[in-house]
Amino acid sequence: MWTGRQLNPHRAAAVATYSGDSFLDIGCGNGQYVLHFKDKFETAGVDIQEYPQWAEAPKKFQVGDAARLPYDDASVDTILSFETLEHVPNPKAVLEEFHRVCRKNIIFSVPNCEVPSSLAASRLTFFHYTDRSHVNFFTRDSLTEMLVETGFRPQDVGLINACPTQPFLNELLALPSFLTRLVGKFAKKDVFRMTILAVASKG
């Protein structure tokens, strides 16, 4: 059970900017976004299992499957789904289900598989590839293509959650501290943005 999900400022800003009057958070986990925005939007959440935090507003949550949502066609303005599609057996079918249920748009995120050359050359492995619950691997191009195939019009497909690559390389090389500082002065300042955040309107 994943209980550590907290509000991410990039995702929260996207919700505040793009959500319609109502949203349904699929794979909502502990319900942070549902609870945080409950006074601004009509909110609800679905996850494959129940979480203790749902007790704060039990009528807003229910257990359900992302590929077979217990909602009527066009029943909410916006679908949210953060870090969900990498886990499901058939992400295209899930996006088609999102298309059925939403009236306006979807806002979602997945791990970014566009690993920068400096990190790839180090042979360090992005945790996304070692998590056995992750069965799908997306780039911005592959995600955009799937959105179009499932009837959405991509509005914004960008990268968030920047992480400098140099600390990973320092740890791999196990350099003395003075060499670490020296390398840091001259090394290319690569940044790996770990997450794709996408907004797409219903076609």
What are the residue ranges of the model-derived segments?
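Conserved N-terminal segment of class I S-adenosyl-L-methionine
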Residues: 1-73, 78, 82, 95, ...
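Short acidic/polar active-site loop segments enriched in Thr and Asp
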Residues: 77, 104, 153
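Residues lining the SAM
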Residues: 82-85, 109
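Short N-terminal helix/helix-N-cap motif within the alpha/beta-hydrolase-1
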Residues: 89-93, 118
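A short glycine-rich, Lys/Arg-flanked "PGG" loop and its adjoining helix->strand segment in the class I
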Residues: 92-107
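Conserved class I S-adenosyl-L-methionine
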Residues: 107-129
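A SAM-dependent methyltransferase catalytic signature shared across enzymes that methylate proteins
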Residues: 143-158
